């Protein structure tokens, strides 16, 4: 995507060195902001129990007959969490 943006970039022929530097700085800042936003979005995609804790607690209740609250620090991998049901 960055290459697409740069290939379409043109600096006017009558731009002096200060104007060209300002254009380059603005484009550089924009690309930096896009990269930072992509990194932040990737960090937000971390798997959590936020949506699944109650579903998993219900499954534990139906299988073991004992309702337990799943701690937020429990492994998000269901197989790993199932091995720790005695600790919940």
From Swiss-Prot:
Which UniProt keyword terms apply here?
Ligase
Q: What happens when the gene is disrupted?
A: Cells lacking pccB and pccX genes accumulate a high level of propionyl-CoA, which would then inhibit CoA-dependent enzymes such as succinyl-CoA synthetase and could partially inhibit the TCA cycle. Also affected in growth and glucose utilization. Cells are unable to produce PHBV and show morphological abnormalitiess such as a decrease of PHBV granules.
Q: What is its EC number?
A: 6.4.1.3
Q: What chemistry does it catalyse, as a reaction equation?
A: propanoyl-CoA + hydrogencarbonate + ATP = (S)-methylmalonyl-CoA + ADP + phosphate + H(+)
Query: What pathway or pathways are given for this protein in its record?
Result: Metabolic intermediate metabolism; propanoyl-CoA degradation; succinyl-CoA from propanoyl-CoA: step 1/3
Q: What does this protein do?
A: Part of the propionyl coenzyme A carboxylase (PCC) complex involved in propionate utilization and in the production of the poly(3-hydroxybutyrate-co-3-hydroxyvalerate)(PHBV), which is a water-insoluble biopolymer used as intracellular energy reserve material when cells grow under conditions of nutrient limitation. The complex catalyzes the carboxylation of propionyl-CoA to methylmalonyl-CoA. PCC is also able to catalyze the carboxylation of acetyl-CoA. PccX could be responsible for the interaction of the biotin carboxylase and carboxyltransferase subunits.
Q: Give the quaternary structure.
A: The propionyl coenzyme A carboxylase (PCC) complex is composed of three subunits: PccA (biotin carboxylase and biotin-carboxyl carrier), PccB (carboxyltransferase) and PccX.
Q: What is this protein called?
A: Propionyl-CoA carboxylase, protein PccX subunit
In its UniProt entry, the species of origin is given as Haloferax mediterranei (strain ATCC 33500 / DSM 1411 / JCM 8866 / NBRC 14739 / NCIMB 2177 / R-4)
Q: Which gene encodes it?
A: pccX
């Amino acid at each position: 995507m960055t290459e697409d943006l740069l290939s379409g970039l043109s600096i006017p022929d009558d731009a002096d060195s200060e104007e060209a530097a300002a254009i380059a700085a603005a484009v550089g800042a924009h690309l930096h902001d896009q990269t930072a936003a992509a990194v932040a979005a990737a960090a937000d995609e971390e798997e959590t129990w936020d949506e699944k804790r109650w579903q998993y607690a219900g499954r534990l209740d139906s299988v073991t007959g004992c309702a337990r609250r799943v701690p937020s620090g429990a492994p998000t991998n269901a197989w790993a969490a199932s091995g720790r049901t005695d600790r919940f």
